[in-house]
Amino acid sequence: MLAEKTRSIIKATVPVLEQQGTVITRTFYKNMLTEHTELLNIFNRTNQKVGAQPNALATTVLAAAKNIDDLSVLMDHVKQIGHKHRALQIKPEHYPIVGEYLLKAIKEVLGDAATPEIINAWGEAYQAIADIFITVEKKMYEEALWPGWKPFDITAKEYVASDIVEFTVKPKFGSGIELESLPITPGQYITVNTHPIRQENQYDALRHYSLCSASTKNGLRFAVKMEAARENFPAGLVSEYLHKDAKVGDEIKLSAPAGDFAINKELIHQNEVPLVLLSSGVGVTPLLAMLEEQVKCNPNRPIYWIQSSYDEKTQAFKKHVDELLAECANVDKIIVHTDTEPLINAAFLKEKSPAHADVYTCGSLAFMQAMIGHLKELEHRDDMIHYEPFGPKMSTVQV
C-alpha cells in the first residue's frame, strides 16, 4: 500500500489528468519511441497515429489515479491489458523504460506545476501499478499454450467477404505444438508477428486477430479485414501484407491464443436467458466461434444473431452462419446493410433483442462505443454486456 501522503498527491492530480492526460501520453509515446526505436517492433504505429493508444493509456492512468486507494478494483482492466501484453511478448524489463518516459512526459507537459513532490509520488505510484501488471502477466506467461513466437505454415487462404480473408495455419513440424490438444476458448485471438516490406517499414509489425473457431481439427483459423487507405492514412500495413503478399505455404509466426472475451459457461446450457451476438464487419469473427460453441452445447437456447456490414458483399461467413443457425431451435437472424439501412441504434436494439439477454458485441472502436452506450441506455446490466473492440479496449472505457 502506498503511503497516505503519496496517495493524496496522486488524487490531487486527477483534474489535470482529466484535462491534459492525452497530451501527456502522446508526448510519452513520441519521446519513448524516438529514443527507443527497438520498441517500434512491438507498438502498433497505426494506433499511435489515430490516437487510440494514447487515449487508452490516458484512460488507464486516470483510472489508476482515481482508484489509487484501492487499485484492486481495476483488476479486470489489468487482466484485459495483461492479455495483450502477454500476446505481444511485453516483459518485466520493459516497465522501467515506460516509467522513465511517463514521468518525463508529465514533467514536460506540466512544466513548473510538476513539482518534485508530484514527480516522486507518481514514480512510486507507477512502480506499484507496474508490479501489479508484472505479477498478473507472469501467471499468463506460465499458462500460455506455448512460449514466445512459434512458426506456422499457411495451409489455406479464403475470402469470406469482399474485404475479409480467412487464414488456416498449422504449426511447423518440430514446433512442439499439438493442435489436437490445444484448449482454445471461443472469443480468443492470436497475435501474428510479420515484417512487411512495404511503406518503408523497417520493423516487425504485430497484430491481434480473432480466431474463427475453437476447433483445431484442420488448424487454427483467423480472419483479417483489408484496412483500405483513407484520408491521411495509408492502407493497413499488416492487413495489406496478409491480403496481397502472404500465400499458402508461407511461414508466419504466432504467439499463443489470448483474451478474456468468452461466452458465459454458466448460461450456455440453460434456455431462460437468451444469447445476443451483435457484430459489425470483421467483428463477427469471435462471435462466430461463440455461436459454434453454443450450438454444440445447447442448440435450444434462444439466440439473436445481429450482424451489420456495409453491404451483402462485405457480410462475412454467410454460408457458415446459416449452417449453424439452421441447427438452432429458437433463433432470430437480423442482417443490417448500412449502405441502404440506418446504423443500429437504441430503438433498433429495443425492438430486436430482449432486455434480459446476455449480450456479446464486437466491432470497431466507434461501433463498440455506440453499442455499449445504446445497451446502457436500455438499462442492460453491466455484467450482461460483454465486448471486444478491434483496438485498445481502454479507449471504450469511461472512468
Curated annotation (Swiss-Prot):
Outline the extent of the FAD-binding FR-type domain.
147-264
* Cofactors required: FAD; heme b
The identity of this protein, by name, is: Flavohemoprotein
Broad EC category: oxidoreductase
Protein origin, superkingdom = Eukaryota
User: Where along the chain is the active site annotated?
Assistant: 95, 137
Which species is the source of this protein? Saccharomyces cerevisiae (strain ATCC 204508 / S288c) (Baker's yeast)
Phosphothreonine occurs at 22
Q: Where in the cell is it found?
A: Cytoplasm
